[in-house]
Amino acid sequence: MTAADIDSKKRKRKHKAKKGEEAEPVKAHTNGAAAVEKPRKKSKKEHTPEPEVEDVVADASENDVESGAEEDEEQVNAELKEIAAKAKKAKKAKAAQDEDEDEDAAGSGANALAVADLPSGTSIPTVDDPTRFDELNLSERTMEAIKTMGFESMTEIQRKAIPPLLSGKDVLGAAKTGSGKTLAFLIPAIEMLSSMRFKPRNGTGVIVVSPTRELALQIFGVARELMEKHSQTFGIVIGGANRRAEAEKLAKGVNLLIATPGRLLDHLHNTQGFVFKNLKSLIIDEADRILEVGFEDEMRSIIKILPTDRQTMLFSATQTTKVEDLARISLKAGPLYINVDYRKEHSTVEGLEQGYVICDSDTRFRLLFSFLKKHQKKKVIVFFSSCNSVKFYAELLNYIDLPVLELHGKLKQQARTNRFFEFCNAQSGTLICTDVAARGLDIPEVDWVIQFDPPDDPRDYIHRVGRTARGSEGKGRSLMFLLPSEIGFLKLLKEARVPLVEFELPANKILNIQSQLEALITKNYYLNKSAKDGYRSYLQAYASHSLRSVFDVHKLDLVKVAKSFGFSTPPRIDISLGASLSRDKKVEGRREYGRQPQQGRRPMKPNKRF
């Protein structure tokens, strides 16, 4: 029975009452829920508390009419109690709904989000063409993190990408390495998670796919700084890490997930507690590199598994046919294309001084040793073409008391992580590595990049030298070693808009240590074995080079090449140079991101100086 029915009965009782007897007026009830005064209107943010059941009964009893009929009064009180009980039930339902909305980000199920699209409260920049982060109308928590990180003005890719990403558009971005695109895609993703109030029970709302473990770790570090004040969760899954621990974290709920393709696909297929049906944003970073190392099939499978109702951001330093195919299947129709480099005169950054030196194979190591000796107080990265070459030269240089760090795909994941961050935090030192460190990694204040072995093509050259002179005002230098037979590579670099000058190094500045090197390799069993592995891998990598017209293995002087590994004569090795090498090289590259064979470090004798 409603309050209106109660009023009708009261009027009947008044009519039957004795003449001249006045009844107390009853307050009007307009909502048909309880006999209380209608509360004043409040703003959306102000919460209007529901009246307690005792208050409802008390207010109704005070406004009840006097009646001579006791049974009528008891009936009215019973009806009022029934109404109060309904009000209490409605209050509990409302409270439960509010609590569910708060915990589920407006969700109605255990881990389902009812909001399919970005909320209407998504940040909109306060100016038409923002140049500073404080003009983007970001949340206070994100802005506080950005200020703590020391950023005020945006780079070009950030200015062009963040506003449309905040509004929910799909973006295909092309930008040089070191352009600041990590913040360009993380800030909109974190703002989306915050505005939708994602909770761990909602599962994963954002996935960032990275080509290498080191780049994934770096993105994870940036995300950790940006999300320090946010309540959303974040995590990382990469090859070589503890899969069971990753699965447990995914089951607890990771709102922002950074991953390498192989491990991500593994969890999508096999981790039952991994909730990704609420995915709102997919970010593919360094897409060209992901495809180059052979993850095309994995990426296609990942895209098929993930929900289609999402925002997608795809960033690639170069636009290839495979990248276009990946964009076609992952992005919605009509994505926004952003290219911040098409008007630039050079393909590399302005603060980078680039040079090359022509030298024979038997001079290369002596030149490198002399250079590193002279620049021990600088921060230097040296690139090699194979894991075994890195292992040999790292063991050799450390043995002769020239400390270096090594980074390559055959290291266990924990060792890779430790050495990467050790070099990042160092003020000076030398890192020798394969191309596993060539893409996307933001290593602070690198002074020199040395390309001991030639890159696979001009694009790889650009990515290698991109480890130095990072940022809008970064400065750095690069030096590439070329054999006389490899000069044709300079023409390709010129066509790719790479400015290079020749560096001339006087012969008297190159230390003459060849005889000591050969004597050491002859006497030390472990170094001798490592040198053979490095020599064989160098020839295999050279034979599988994509630019065989320039890098022709048959033009190599094997005697001089052997001397660069400490042999007086070329060692007898089991090697096959053929068409299969290119395929083997790709398989080896894939293995860097998958399960690793057990590696043990060879025991060394005490250090010996030349």
UniProtKB/Swiss-Prot annotation:
The keyword Nucleotide-binding applies. One of its GO terms (molecular function) is ATP hydrolysis activity. Residues 351-521 form the Helicase C-terminal domain. GO terms for biological process: maturation of LSU-rRNA from tricistronic rRNA transcript (SSU-rRNA, 5.8S rRNA, LSU-rRNA). Residues 584-594 have a biased composition (Basic and acidic residues). Residues 51-76 have a biased composition (Acidic residues). It comes from the Eukaryota. A motif (DEAD box) lies at residues 285-288. Its main location: nucleus. Coiled coil: none annotated. Keywords: ATP-binding, Helicase, Hydrolase, Nucleotide-binding, Nucleus, Ribosome biogenesis, RNA-binding, rRNA processing. It is found in: Nucleus, Nucleolus. SUPFAM superfamilies: P-loop containing nucleoside triphosphate hydrolases. Transmembrane segments: none annotated. ATP binds at A175, K176, T177, G178, S179, G180, K181, T182. ATP-dependent RNA helicase involved in 40S ribosomal subunit biogenesis. Required for the processing and cleavage of 35S pre-rRNA at sites A0, A1, and A2, leading to mature 18S rRNA. Associates in the nucleolus with the 60S and pre-60S ribosomal subunits. This is ATP-dependent RNA helicase HAS1. It comes from Phaeosphaeria nodorum (strain SN15 / ATCC MYA-4574 / FGSC 10173) (Glume blotch fungus).
